[in-house]
UniProtKB/Swiss-Prot annotation:
It comes from Bos taurus (Bovine). Keywords: Acetylation, Cell membrane, Cytoplasm, Endoplasmic reticulum, Hydrolase, Iron, Isomerase, Lipid metabolism, Lipoprotein, Membrane, Metal-binding, Microsome, Palmitate, Phosphoprotein, Sensory transduction, Vision. Palmitoylation by LRAT regulates ligand binding specificity; the palmitoylated form (membrane form) specifically binds all-trans-retinyl-palmitate, while the soluble unpalmitoylated form binds all-trans-retinol (vitamin A). The lineage of its organism: Eukaryota, Metazoa, Chordata, Craniata, Vertebrata. Its main location: cytoplasm. GO terms for biological process: detection of light stimulus involved in visual perception; retina homeostasis; retinal metabolic process; zeaxanthin biosynthetic process. Fe cation binds at residues 180, 241, 313, 527. This is Retinoid isomerohydrolase. The modification Phosphothreonine is found at residues 101, 105.
């Protein structure tokens, strides 16, 4: 991958500045030629409000949700954005203060209330945020913006108007759900969230939302739990951001980053903690990998174990003969990476940003190979017999299977993150190419393509340019896996540049096809999708 680039001007700080929403779409200035087959909308979520009055938000995942849209039609591009009218946002705007506790920011009681009313207000229970700043996904004919709690927010993908809040707890037994559901080609949605299982111990439920049926009823009302994974700790679930899915299997990676529920329920209610205060690391458990039979809806009790890492994003998971291939964006060690994503750290001058990143867990793209058929007679042997990987799986005398990965990409403080693939055709299947956002000491400064078979890489990078997660859009007449384009929102605060633009790259070699520039800044976005017309 590319050599390390320096950012002494600190232009990345523009990613974390408050912006205003738009009353109507802006016409973007296009250079290059946008493919005429590219028609539809790029929808993205991220924070757009980093303070309320004089009260700042402290963490990257705290700012109020802003929904962005780039529309493509006949070679022209428009840009629009609206704040999502969540309860967190509406109440903050009404009361001119932070009302609901966010990921790393505490909401304090109304200063107008006396001490007694403030005290009793703490006992109304934990007020969970609905700040849907992480992702957007389809359910039936509808679209929902989400964070990682039990609340998702229905939005209009054309006007960007907020329609309604939905509480998943009204339909299934989960305390929350990830912002990375899997969407099958027929519209079936799978997700995972922790729950209270037998004897009040914690477990993880897989939620299935069916596709839209002939009766046109809301598919969410037909949600069901299809399988349950056990938890390594009865009262401390692991933080889960994504999971793996193939036609026949579900893969859940349980990391040592734990949520202390006692702290969540007591400290939060009584002393005003936030989500970040409730995380802790189990320094001895390592990582447990779990699998379930998707079609039979049955947990498979194979005890896969490996050394500790943080995990946020699965790249892809697929079946290869009697093995599961699990490709992950890992961060080495048990310390929580989110400890390094406070806005004060991310807004530091470049030398301080680098100093902070050197203390953090280091990134690595890894492939784990999970054998499905375990024969006790093979104790002490490597069960991986595939010829095309160096990953191993050793059956131990205690019946655990110790996994060592094949490293697909590693660079000191150079992460390949926010991965995307040709998901519609290759999700859950053997594949060759992954696209990622390159993080340089946590600063997004390049786009990458990785051949997971040969480990060859391609890079797009320009000075003072800070891209977002790459979104792959397949050519309608594609013959090969990487026939298409890659879309990314780039913030470009350098002298002589427009503040931001939508970048279109050839997915084959990451060469520029076109860009659509706008005259306003666009803050950081996390995840999104391309909605075809």
């Amino acid at each position: 991958m590319s050599s390390q680039v320096e950012h002494p001007a600190g232009g990345y700080k523009k990613l974390f500045e408050t912006v205003e929403e738009l009353s109507s779409p802006l016409t973007a200035h296009v250079t290059g030629r946008i493919p005429l087959w590219l028609t539809g909308s790029l929808l993205r979520c991220g924070p757009g409000l980093f303070e309320v009055g004089s009260e700042p938000f402290y963490h990257l995942f705290d700012g109020q949700a802003l929904l962005h849209k780039f529309d493509f039609k006949e070679g022209h591009v428009t840009y629009h954005r609206r704040f999502i009218r969540t309860d967190a946002y509406v109440r903050a705007m009404t009361e001119k203060r932070i009302v609901i506790t966010e990921f790393g920011t505490c909401a304090f009681p109304d200063p107008c209330k006396n001490i007694f009313s403030r005290f009793f207000s703490y006992f109304r229970g934990v007020e969970v945020t609905d700040n849907a700043l992480v992702n957007i996904y389809p359910v039936g004919e509808d679209y929902y913006a989400c964070t990682e709690t039990n609340f998702i927010t229905k939005v209009n993908p054309e006007t960007l108007e907020t329609i309604k809040q939905v509480d998943l707890c009204n339909y299934v037994s989960v305390n929350g759900a990830t912002a990375h559901p899997h969407i099958e080609n027929d519209g079936t949605v799978y997700n995972i969230g922790n729950c209270f299982g037998k004897n009040f111990s914690i477990a993880y439920n897989i939620v299935k939302i069916p596709p839209l049926q002939a009766d046109k009823e809301d598919p969410i009302s037909k949600s069901e739990i299809v399988v349950q994974f056990p938890c390594s700790d009865r009262f401390k679930p692991s933080y889960v951001h994504s999971f793996g899915l193939t036609p026949n299997y579900i893969v859940f990676v349980e990391t040592p980053v734990k949520i202390n529920l006692f702290k969540f329920l007591s400290s939060w209610s009584l002393w005003g903690a936030n989500y970040m205060d409730c995380f802790e690391s189990n320094e001895t458990m390592g990582v447990w990998l779990h699998i379930a039979d998707k079609k039979r809806k049955k947990y498979i009790n194979n005890k896969y174990r490996t050394s500790p890492f943080n995990l946020f994003h699965h790249i892809n998971t697929y079946e290869d003969h009697e093995f599961l291939i699990v490709d992950l964006c890992c961060w080495k060690g048990f310390e929580f990476v989110y400890n390094y994503l406070y806005l004060a750290n991310l807004r530091e001058n470049w030398e301080e940003v680098k100093k902070n990143a050197r203390k953090a867990p280091q990134p690595e793209v890894r492939r784990y190979v999970l054998p499905l058929n375990i024969d006790k007679a093979d104790t002490g042997k490597n069960l991986v017999t595939l010829p095309n990987t160096t990953a191993t799986a050793i059956l131990c005398s205690d019946e655990t299977i110790w996994l060592e990965p094949e490293v697909l990409f590693s660079g000191p403080r150079q992460a390949f993150e926010f991965p995307q693939i040709n998901y519609q055709k290759y999700g859950g299947k053997p594949y060759t190419y992954a696209y990622g956002l390159g993080l340089n000491h946590f600063v997004p400064d390049r786009l990458c393509k990785l051949n997971v078979k040969t480990k060859e890489t391609w890079v797009w990078q320009e000075p003072d340019s800070y891209p977002s997660e790459p979104i792959f859009v397949s050519h309608p007449d594609a013959l090969e896996e990487d026939d298409g384009v890659v879309l990314s929102v780039v913030v470009s605060p350098g002298a002589g540049q427009k503040p931001a633009y939508l970048l279109i790259l050839n997915a084959k070699d990451l060469s520029e096809v076109a860009r659509a520039e706008v005259e306003i800044n666009i803050p950081v976005t996390f995840h999104g999708l391309f909605k075809k017309s």
